[in-house]
Amino acid sequence: MKTEFSLAQLADPDIAVADKILRACVHCGFCTATCPTYVLLGDELDSPRGRIYLIKEMLEKDRPPTAEVVKHIDRCLSCLACMTTCPSGVHYMHLVDQARVRIERDYSRPLAERALRAVLALVLPRPGLFRASMIMARLARPFAALLPASNAAATPGLLRRIKAMLALAPNSLPAPGPSGGSVFAAIGERRGRVALLQGCAQQVLAPRINQAAINLLTRHGIEVVLVRDEQCCGALTHHLGHDGDALARARANVTVWQKEAEQGGLDAILVTASGCGTVIKDYGFMLREDRDFAQGAARISALAKDITEYLAGLSLAPSRQKGDVTVAYHSACSLQHGQKITGLPKELLSKNGFVVKDVPESHLCCGSAGTYNILQPDIASRLRDRKIANIATVKPDMIAAGNIGCMVQIAGGTSVPVVHTIELLDWATGGPKPGSIGQD
Amino acid sequence: MAIMMPAADQAVLDRRGEIVTALRAIVPGEGVIDSAAEMQVYESDGLTAYRQPPMVVVLPDTTEQVSQVLKYCFEQGIKVVPRGSGTSLSGGALPLSDGVLLGLGKFKRIREIDFDNRVVVTEPGVTNLAISQAVAHAGFYYAPDPSSQIACSIGGNVAENSGGVHCLKYGMTTNNVLGCEIVLMSGEILRIGGKAAENSGYDLMGIITGSEGLLGVITEITVRILQKPETARALMVGFAEVEAAGECVARIIGAGIIPGGMEMMDKPAIHAAEAFVHAGYPLDVDALLIIELDGPGVEVDELIKRVETIAQGCGSTTCQISTSEAERNLFWAGRKAAFPAVGRISPDYLCMDGTIPRGALPKALARIRDLSEKYQLGVANVFHAGDGNLHPLILYDANKPGEIERAEAFGADILRACVEFGGVLTGEHGVGIEKRDLMPEMFSEVDLNQQQRLKCAFDSQGLLNPGKVFPTLHRCAELGRVHVHGGKLAFPDIPRF
Amino acid sequence: MDTLKVRDAKDVEEVVRAAIASEQPLEVIGHGTRRAIGHPMATNAVLDVSDLNAVTAYEPNELIITVQAGVPLADVQSLIDSKNQQFAFEPMNTSVLLGTSGNGTIGGMIGAGLAGPRRIRAGGARDHLLGAHAVSGFGDSFKTGGRVVKNVTGYDLCKLLAGSWGTLAVMTEVTLKVMPKPESERTLMLSGLDDVTANKAMTAALGSPYDVSGAAHLPNSAFRSATGALAGLAAQGPAVTLLRLEGIAASVADRATSLARTLAPFGSVEMLQDTASAAAWGAIRDVEPFAAGGALGNWPVWRIVCPPAAGGALGQAMARETGGDVIYDWGGGLIWAALPPKSDAQAALVRQRVEAAGGHAALIRAPEETRRKVAVFHPQAGGVAALSQRVRHSFDPKIILNRGRMLLIAAT
């Protein structure tokens, strides 16, 4: 498309990147087809093409974001289905990330909303605080019935969002897993050494996911280290537009991982939450202008792998599965669109004796999208219900996914056990049979 | 903007506030959009060279709302521009500054799938591909497949009479639609046709299809679905010269073979598509033919042999035949995304659409080459070789002064050449605003008047999408006048019995 | 009544203008073979275009033929046949049903829009008319469409001309799409099925991927007057359901086997090949069982179009209630019904049943007195009827052309 930035504007490296992205867009509209909000709402404003247009206008005119622009950008799930669909190679992710930063910086949200977002940004990335908040949520849950239900209001109110948050809290919390600094030796001959991202929400809600990963990896001769002083990857705050916080975390992680790589050697940094994986793989871009961290970040991004990517390179022990478990594979957006990992997890499951079924409309987000299911509960629940209905058509025994957010979202609406892909692979190669998430 | 649109009605603009209020009473919630920032995303469809924010955007949920909106606008003399997915390449959904932009994006339900009668009844906002996906489990599909099928709406397809790769064998939208529910500008809701193969009386469905949003707003459509052929395989054949490829096309048709699809791409188009899709397109050929043969396995095998022989007889330099469904789709993936893939080699492009008799293909391409020289703009050619429908993609950079004007002049010359070679201005994208001013190249004033009179039968006030398709607007009363010539009773020199 | 035999388009313009000036409506004919279809017209003179009979251009490699409207249909068919091409929509030869001689002109073929069995696969006349030059009821020559298939330039007026029974404009020259003739054909026959079961069999066949190009059912009563091609089938005794496959020989053979398997639940199939198959379909196309020269020659005949899956039940009930005979084509979507002669051709009953099934009915053959008082073409719902009238007025405001033919009350 034609862009109208002045030379002065283009001197800003972020604007230069935005200009390049905008000029790649030819306004063809293919992206609207796979955008979950456009599919639900049928309004160009809630489509990638429309958002691109709004962002373009905002950046070109260098005006503060308006309430309307914020409303539509807030509704974006950052599922990145549009990027998979776009034939012109528009890097929508980088554009909307920029827009969120600008909104956070230049737009004054209503007080209640600001407070809620601040609490989310504070609590979610800190396992200790998150754990405490989950306990409180469990206590508060009986009162959720008093909070307003879904309505057609343009922007969900605070109480509506709190109700959504309470609904997501699990009935019980599992005991915490191993802490940073732990090293798990390979069983038998050591063939490799990896760091395993500890995550933030995942280690509170489902430490068994990483436990399964550790079991599987060590069983196959891979030493696993949980790097000390590793932090939340920054995805949550990044998507809230809190760039400062996100970049600080990125830098901190790059530092500790580089140190670990230098000291003990790392073949890869494995991630079991694909939402994190996408961001860590983007560290190189996020820190490209930071003279001190650019190179390190690029190296770390290259080292980062989703656990299924890494497993594809290992020859796994023969499976004990007899082909009598039907698994609906839920393709997390961050995995299929963000990291372009589509067939790999399914092949792994299928090779290891599971009957794998694709879910209809698999390109559509389940509605979890980080904090989206809290901040946009009505759209999130519509997407969740649609996803669950689609999954039900294949009548699975279990639902497998590669991202904790999806697992919590989907488990909230079905009684079919929801597990992580790695748990199934661990089970197939000698580990225990996994139960559903939230039922430990 | 180079194209003149009907003059804005200041009286209407002055009442904008009151109009917005009235529309909000009909379409509650978020369905009425009137802030400048939000309306802006609706200012253009797939033809980005033209932009015009509307006076207000209305996104109704139900047919009843559509009817009430139109009725209100009819009574108030307010113009209306309908919009589907906004993927039109001819500016069909370009708003008017004093008009309502009526978006059908919320009409997203498939209402009925009837396998026994082999039809699907759908709302207009459902995408073309979604219809095929909805019936795929039973081995059916909806045949017309414009390249934008992932996103384009079936309502838009009906308005434009869209084609696509497979329309060579399976027909265009008009050959695959049996009925509709349409709301006239007066607000009147009519049901035309249904599940029967043809209607009684005049073929109103036939005239509504391709009417580019000028005759009514479609709120439901009944389409034919076909059983998928047993098998489909594609050949990808490269030629050192475009003329050889054109000859191959002619010979295939001449041999009585009607392929499921037969497409041609020239070198620049091949390169752009390959960069996106990595299908293994040969990068050193001047023309690539992708020919699809579908039907029973035995037939496809036989036809592949015949086509291969013909291609070799025309001097093909490369030939690949798909061996799996995945491979066949890969061959097509680049062609189907060719237009936007060109976005990788050029910031902007103007996608032309004209049809010529197949035999004139080499002549037309030679002329396009000459024009490319004349206007100093690159061009990538993609076309439905099977039916002579050309899509030259004129590459330009809107950020460079003068380029868009040169691109438009280039495009207009191409279309004039199409008419000159015995063809027509537009094969499937519609006239819209893009080719409106070229209509006199093809039609005389009498021809155009007859078409406009038909419009009067549907929209006597001329409020639905004025400024599209026809270069001048006439008052219906003026067009309806019969001129009595001479008043003579009989002409003596005509033989009579 | 004067017959004005025009020589060219200019003549047509003059005649129409004179008719407008003197308010003398015209009956437009080619050879007049289909004059008896529709209401008796309220016209004062006959405009005869049969001298506009040149073949302007035939381009087999472009799959098009451009002819003047008065060219005999039979002549065009043998011309394109010589190049192994055909009108894929199988235009009906109305002479059998109407007892006229000859099958008229190309203009009549288009104006009548009566397509044969292959309509289910290839579409109707309206899907093959690419362009036309015509003179409107304003007395002006106009053109619409073009000479190429892919054409969306302006409104598709050709669609209105097809099936308009000459009431919108006088065609002077038209361009039609031609298609290659199939190399071979074969017909699968099931016998003894009742109408509803036959309908299911046809539905199964048309829902298969075997590219069925003809699906018809002849109840056994249809054979009482069997002549010609169907006489042989009559020897079967019970009803016959026919499914046609066309294409290259190896493909047809292969598909026949597959289709037979699909139809196994309905019984075993017998085969008709090539000429025998073609003859049978010709007889179905022209509704031979109800031929004017046959046993039911003086029975009124309805042409009913309905959703195909509803045809069997509809036809069976109607035959029972009216005492008439029916034959089915288009997989059940086209029903020809010959009814015992009654002055109103049982119109009310027929139309009520047909409408309930989602279809429409036209009284194609009936004595003139019947056609004076019974609506020949299916009455349309209020809004659609009004729109159709406005459409007509946009072509012929003074209702000069074939006045009274389509609507029961002569419109003014």
Q: What does each model-found stretch correspond to?
A:
Chain B
Residues 1-497:
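Noncatalytic alpha-helical scaffold of FAD-dependent oxidoreductases
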